[in-house]
Amino acid sequence: SDLIPNLFHKLSGQYYYFRDQSKKMFKKEIDNIFEDNDFSSMLNTFFAKRDLEQYAVYNSLAMIDSYFSRLEHILVLALPFSKNNKEYDIKKFIGEFWSKKYSEVFDLNNQDSKRIHDELNLIKEKYRNTFAHGGFEKKGQSFHFHLENYGVVPATMSDYKNSVHFNFTPLNESEFENICLFFDVVDNFFKENLEASWMFCNSGLDLIMDDESLSRLLKKAEDLEVFRNWLDSENERLSNYINAAY
């Protein structure tokens, strides 16, 4: 029978690792040691700060990437719960874009679902896709332009929020914090609106796709308390089996 491995904890671990690394890098202070306003030590401090900021950005982009991988994984594991015995093709679904997956699991006519989808899409287009497409934005352009006496300055010229952004890095600390806050909102939205699916993801149990296993799973999920106890006992049974095998 088809089995879909539950990688929720692995993908969560990856996401939180990059998130913690970014936070540390953004918060890390560089000692300002200016000996008699010595220009070279000022310059060294500037470059050290810039390097830290770059490392924070690398980790932030990896965090965003990891979050979307985890998001798609949750949607795959949630599909049988949201379809509940309706016809669907899980193999085809796995190959779909994240937004198609999202719209299969959530009703985009619902205002909250739509708002979260659109905000995720903005983050995806601005941060994830820019770097997935060789560092070029799909909407708008990535330009560098010359500034008198300063040389070439990176500028992100795009139609996001109809504004022009001038920056040395693709995202800063406050943007990083806002993205983290928003990802937490999305997680809470999932917990509330995909309760059984979220519990299943957290259980770490693999999704077994044969008719008998699936209908038993969905039957148990009709009552969340029953479902929670069942997941616990399945996990216990599995760990006893693994321990006995070794």
What are these regions (language model features)?
Residues 76-96, 137-147:
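Short acidic alpha-helical/loop segments enriched in Asp/Glu that coordinate divalent cations
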Residues 53-82:
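Short, hydrophobic, well-ordered secondary-structure elements
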Residues 1-58:
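Charged alpha-helical initiation segments
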Residues 87-116:
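Active-site-proximal segments of catalytic enzyme domains
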Residues 10, 14-17, 69, 119, ...:
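Charged, amphipathic alpha-helical oligomerization/scaffolding segments
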Residues 72-79, 129-140, 191:
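Charged/polar positions within long, soluble alpha-helices
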